Amino acid sequence: MNKANSFSKEELVTCGHGNLFGANSPRLPIDNMLMIDRITKINDDGGEFGKGEIVAELDIDPSLWFFGCHFETDPVMPGCLGLDAMWQLVGFFLGWEGAEGKGRALGVGEVKFTGQVLPDAKKVTYKLTIKRKVYRKLVMGIADAVMEVDGREIYSATDLKVGIFTDTSSF
């Protein structure tokens, strides 16, 4: 298993194809839905709760697909994409720790949007701290997160929940 503490875009895409941690590990989305360009820090003992943390980045470019359709004369990154990136990172963390199965977002406690990502921004940074890890019949990660644009916090989310399932047919 790859226990590196940072990952490039190429490695994240490899994860999306099931080839980073193994064919049965949780996958990241690929292509336009992958909202992460790199993970600059990941560990299993850091963060506010001492259970792990992740720092990741997305480079902003005016040509990103969502600026062309959200909205035509008022381009802004949809808030749901930032939230989804946070869930993506919780699932990635569980795969990095060795979980096997398919990742599914299970919920979030509270989300706050206090800013926006516009086409002239340069970089989004996601900072997650793992609050709880469950490795029983149900594998689940719970995290708190913030999203910054060019160093300014604009989103926060508490109790992001992601489960890892070996069978999703009854979902």
Curated annotation (Swiss-Prot):
Disulphide connectivity of cysteines: none
Function (record text): Necessary for the introduction of cis unsaturation into fatty acids. Catalyzes the dehydration of (3R)-3-hydroxydecanoyl-ACP to E-(2)-decenoyl-ACP and then its isomerization to Z-(3)-decenoyl-ACP. Can catalyze the dehydratase reaction for beta-hydroxyacyl-ACPs with saturated chain lengths up to 16:0, being most active on intermediate chain length.
Gene Ontology annotations of biological process type: unsaturated fatty acid biosynthetic process
NCBIfam families linked: fabA, PRK05174.1
Gene name tied to this protein: fabA
Top-level division of the source organism's lineage: Bacteria
Gene Ontology terms: cellular component: cytoplasm
Pathway(s) per entry: Lipid metabolism; fatty acid biosynthesis
Official protein name in the record: 3-hydroxydecanoyl-[acyl-carrier-protein] dehydratase
Subcellular location as annotated: Cytoplasm
InterPro entries named in the record: FabA, FabA_FabZ, HotDog_dom_sf
Family indicated by similarity: Belongs to the thioester dehydratase family. FabA subfamily.
Subunit text: Homodimer.
Pfam families xrefs: FabA
Annotated active site: H70
EC numbers, comma separated: 4.2.1.59, 5.3.3.14
One Gene Ontology molecular-function label: (3R)-hydroxyacyl-[acyl-carrier-protein] dehydratase activity
Swiss-Prot/TrEMBL catalytic activity: a (3R)-hydroxyacyl-[ACP] = a (2E)-enoyl-[ACP] + H2O; (3R)-hydroxydecanoyl-[ACP] = (2E)-decenoyl-[ACP] + H2O; (2E)-decenoyl-[ACP] = (3Z)-decenoyl-[ACP]
Major location category of this protein: cytoplasm
Keyword terms: Cytoplasm, Fatty acid biosynthesis, Fatty acid metabolism, Isomerase, Lipid biosynthesis, Lipid metabolism, Lyase
